[in-house]
């Protein structure tokens, strides 16, 4: 039987986790494989030590590792290990942490010789299809390279690199079996990793600093409301039985609360709170449109969720530069007054060093938000996330970005005898 290891790793050094969410992305892939590829035995990994042990005990035929800003170097380390332990294995990487520009994407694979394939875009079906194609060529990565593989970057037998751009997202999300309801994620009710749920995918906004601001994600698609309710209930029951101290629920949507069904889902969470005492904290990025719906969602969560209104900047020129529109501050102040009167909490966020921002305009925004009575204000430095328009070479040149690198908080560790660090690129100056 073909073995596939699916790893969405988080640094775990001295018990400190670099990411405290369950590995939902690769769990989707396993759920599809379990249904569609019965001849494949797949396992999901979140913790590096467990993956290391499994790879030494039984090196997989295929290793698939997720690539995010918090685990790229960590994934690279295990890609190299896979080739050391079993040179004929196929090593696949996927995830949003890769540049938008085709030339830089091709260069990425060239710079990482342990990788055979990079999956672009959503991998729920692309990754299982890749394994299916591999089975058809008897597991030969060389013969795999002779095929035309959509949404992938991969090596041809002659050493050249093939590039097939992402195909448009078209399949219904409910075609993906739920990794919660199928039990794929049951082993991660361990009291360390918080449950993570998607109710939809995609974003109607075009913010250039965000991966979901790109055209690939411009259509919002939904998991059925019935399925999401069942997932919430499934999680609540197991949290109560297995790890009652875990009070957190993380919702992965980019604009939770903006749609009418979100209000209904929050009502269901409120009912679960009464029955199971969970969740006590809902970590969700609330939408910046339809504030009346967002407020209703916050209210129905019995105080477990805050109104998260990340303005990023209050300067109109900056907002145009990053293709973003904010709710007017006066309207936001009215929302805040309404929420405070009901005992609800609010939080906002600014980003330092956005294109066009000046020291004066940034300080002015800080003062306005403080004066508006925000309960909590976060001030971040602009990170050049791979996969965003802001990170492209053209944008860098347009706004004369000067950037530097630093280790991301909690994203380092020692694995075997190797020290591994994951870093971020931040902007330290612009032309303003």
PLM segments and residue spans:
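A structural motif corresponding to the C-terminal lobe/cap of the Radical SAM core domain
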Residues: 2, 60, 222, 271-432
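Conserved N-terminal glycine/acidic-rich loop preference
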Residues: 7, 11, 20, 59-70, ...
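Short beta-strand segments
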Residues: 5-8, 44, 64-69, 93-94, ...
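Radical SAM [4Fe-4S] cluster-binding motif and immediate context
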Residues: 174-341
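N-terminal [4Fe-4S]-dependent radical SAM core
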Residues: 1-5, 11-12, 149, 153-196
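A general structural detector for well-ordered alpha-helical segments in enzyme core domains, enriched
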Residues: 29, 51, 74, 78-82, ...
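Glycine- and acidic-residue-enriched helix-capping/strand-helix junction motifs
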Residues: 13-26
């Amino acid at each position: 039987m073909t073995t596939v290891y699916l790893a969405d790793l988080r640094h775990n050094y001295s018990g400190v986790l670099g990411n405290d969410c369950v590995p939902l992305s690769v769990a989707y892939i396993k759920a599809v494989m379990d249904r569609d590829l019965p001849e494949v035995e797949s396992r999901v990994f979140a913790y590096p030590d467990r993956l290391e042990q499994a790879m030494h005990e039984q090196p997989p035929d295929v290793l698939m590792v997720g690539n995010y800003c918090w685990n790229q170097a960590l994934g690279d380390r295990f890609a190299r290990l896979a080739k050391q332990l079993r040179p004929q294995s196929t090593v696949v990487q996927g995830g949003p942490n890769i540049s938008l520009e085709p030339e830089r994407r091709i260069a990425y694979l060239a710079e990482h010789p342990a990788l055979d394939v990079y999956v672009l875009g959503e991998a729920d079906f692309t990754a299982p299809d890749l394994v299916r194609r591999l089975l058809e060529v008897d597991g030969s990565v060389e013969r795999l390279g002779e095929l035309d593989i959509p949404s992938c970057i991969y090596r041809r037998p002659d050493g050249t690199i093939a590039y097939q751009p992402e195909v448009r997202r078209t399949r219904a999300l409910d075609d993906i079996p739920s990794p919660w309801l199928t039990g794929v994620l049951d082993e991660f009710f361990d009291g360390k990793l918080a449950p993570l749920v998607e109710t939809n995918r995609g974003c109607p906004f075009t913010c250039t600093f965000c991966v979901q601001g790109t055209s690939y994600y411009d259509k919002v698609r939904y998991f059925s409301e019935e399925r999401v309710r069942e997932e919430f209930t499934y999680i609540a029951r197991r949290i109560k039985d297995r790890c009652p101290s875990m009070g957190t629920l993380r919702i992965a949507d980019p604009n939770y609360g903006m749609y009418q069904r979100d209000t209904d889902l929050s009502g269901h969470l409120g009912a679960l709170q009464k029955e199971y005492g969970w969740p006590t904290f809902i970590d969700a990025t609330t939408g910046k449109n339809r504030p009346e719906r967002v407020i209703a969602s916050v209210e129905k969560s019995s105080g477990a969720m805050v109104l998260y209104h990340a303005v990023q900047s209050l300067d109109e020129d900056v907002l145009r530069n990053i293709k973003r529109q904010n709710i007017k501050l006066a309207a936001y102040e009215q929302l805040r007054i309404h929420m405070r009167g009901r005992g609800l909490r609010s939080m906002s966020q600014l980003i330092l060093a956005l294109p066009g921002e000046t020291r004066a305009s940034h300080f002015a925004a800080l003062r306005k938000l403080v004066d508006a009575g925000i309960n909590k204000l976060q001030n971040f430095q602009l990170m050049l996330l791979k996969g965003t328009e802001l990170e492209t070479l053209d944008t860098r040149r347009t706004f004369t970005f000067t950037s530097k690198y630093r280790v991301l908080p909690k994203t380092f560790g020692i694995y075997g005898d190797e020290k591994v660090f994951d870093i971020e690129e931040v902007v330290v100056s612009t032309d303003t």
